[in-house]
Amino acid sequence: MAKPLPKISSRRNGRIGSRKNSRKIPKGVIHVQASFNNTIVTITDVRGRVISWSSAGTCGFRGTRRGTPFAAQTAAGNAIRTVVDQGMQRAEVMIKGPGLGRDAALRAIRRSGILLSFVRDVTPMPHNGCRPPKKRRV
């Protein structure tokens, strides 16, 4: 009977070190999505691959407190802390949405020491596209 050949490389033993810490990212893009209910901060490299992300919900805020500026500031600080350790020095900021956390997240990003090349508002605005939902009657 033939002996089974051992697997040369499987998915489990293929990686020796942690993949997250192996990359040094000098430049990236910080996306801030600020809705009225939550603020999500995603940090990607220039090609668009996600490096780090955080939201007000993952920082422990629940309910209406997720939409506050302080929650947005905490979420931005959490997301940025990991990429500063990986060596990010320059970034572009894309802010989307009408929420209260827009300015607070931007202040937290400025305070982190990352040099911002530009800040762009990418809030989607319809050119009279879809009909909006009917007004609430309370």
From Swiss-Prot:
Entry's localization field: Plastid, Chloroplast
Broad class of the protein's primary localization: plastid
Domain of life the protein comes from: Eukaryota
Biological processes per GO annotation: translation
Keyword Ribosomal protein belongs to the record: yes
Protein keywords: Chloroplast, Plastid, Ribonucleoprotein, Ribosomal protein, RNA-binding, rRNA-binding
Signal sequence, start to end: none
Pfam families: Ribosomal_S11 (PF00411)
Gene Ontology, cellular component aspect: chloroplast; ribonucleoprotein complex; ribosome
Gene Ontology MF terms in the entry: rRNA binding; structural constituent of ribosome
Presence of the UniProt keyword Cytoplasm in the record: no
Comp. bias regions, Basic residues: 9-24
Region named Disordered: 1-24
Subunit structure: Part of the 30S ribosomal subunit.
UniProt record similarity statement: Belongs to the universal ribosomal protein uS11 family.
Protein name, entry field: Small ribosomal subunit protein uS11c
The organism of origin for this protein: Manihot esculenta
Phylogenetic classification of the source organism: Eukaryota, Viridiplantae, Streptophyta, Embryophyta, Tracheophyta
Gene assigned in the entry: rps11
